Regions:
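Short linear motifs at protein or domain termini
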Residues: 1-111
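Generic alpha-helix signal with a bias toward terminal, lower-confidence helices
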Residues: 35, 40, 46, 52, ...
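Membrane-interface aromatic/basic loop that binds lipid-linked glycans or pyrophosphate carriers
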Residues: 235
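Short helix-capping and inter-helix turn/linker motifs at the boundaries of alpha-helical repeat units
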Residues: 10, 190-194
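Conserved amphipathic alpha-helical segments that form helical-bundle/coiled-coil interaction surfaces
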Residues: 108-184, 195-199, 213-228, 232
């Protein structure tokens, strides 16, 4: 029976996770002012450095607003958030398969992959194909669910790197948590095997410069995600 590796989170990670949970649960409300960093450090029993680093990360993720000489405030993260905010919401929920997250995410990822795979069929060459074959080999050998999900993302990110422009890998990397969460949630339910044939089909289509088939292979993956979503909310 395979076991997952245990990783100890840092104090900053724990502080950020606690604050995110309090904001997302509504315990801390938009516009509410936080205690001073010194007070937060005392209440959470961590150092000022941990609190300061955590607040910086939460501000970058759109959850907090730092007003110089005035204080730190909880934001209306629907208006101030970004992909980091969405990633935090996904982690808080524990699954992509919820009514308010799944369908918009599918639409976004399908447009992203259509754009990426069409470019990859034009631009990618032998070096990229070899790298993708190695990733698929690692995917076949992977044991842990999280490893398989990470390798599935790496497959598309490596494809983006092969497109010859900074834009493709950067925008694909921005969607990393979305893509990884989709694969991780579905691999927990279906296992990794159903996703290998579409990935193999994608690589074959890239070699053939067949954008329609490459995009169609990703849509096969999306349909498997959609089946899980439908069964989740079938009642």
């Amino acid at each position: 029976m395979p076991f997952q590796k245990l990783v100890t989170p840092s104090l900053t990670d724990l502080f950020v996770s606690q604050m995110e949970s309090m904001i997302l649960s509504g315990e801390l409300k938009p516009g509410e002012q936080l205690p001073t960093e010194r007070e937060l450090a005392a209440r959470t029993d961590v150092s000022l450095a941990v609190v300061h680093s955590g607040i910086t990360r939460l501000a970058e993720a759109g959850f907090l607003r730092v007003a110089p000489r005035k204080g730190v405030y909880v934001t209306d993260y629907l208006r101030t958030g970004n992909l980091e905010t969405l990633n935090a919401i996904l982690k808080y929920r524990g699954s992509i398969f919820s009514k308010d997250l799944f369908l918009p995410t599918m639409t976004y990822l399908q447009h992203l992959m259509d754009w990426l795979l069409e470019a990859a069929c034009r631009e990618c060459g032998g070096e990229t194909w070899s790298a993708l074959e190695q990733i698929l080999d690692d995917y076949r050998k992977s044991i842990r669910q999280t490893e398989a999900a990470e390798l599935a993302f790496r497959f598309y990110h490596e494809t983006a790197v092969g497109c010859g422009s900074y834009v493709y890998p950067y925008l694909t990397a921005a969607a990393k948590d979305l893509i990884t969460q989709c694969f991780a949630s579905s691999i927990r339910i279906l296992g990794k095997d159903p996703f290998l044939p579409p990935l193999e089909e994608t690589l074959a289509a890239l070699r053939d410069r067949d954008a329609e088939t490459a995009c169609g292979a990703f849509r096969k993956i999306c349909r498997q995600w959609e089946e899980i979503y439908t069964s989740t909310f079938s009642e």
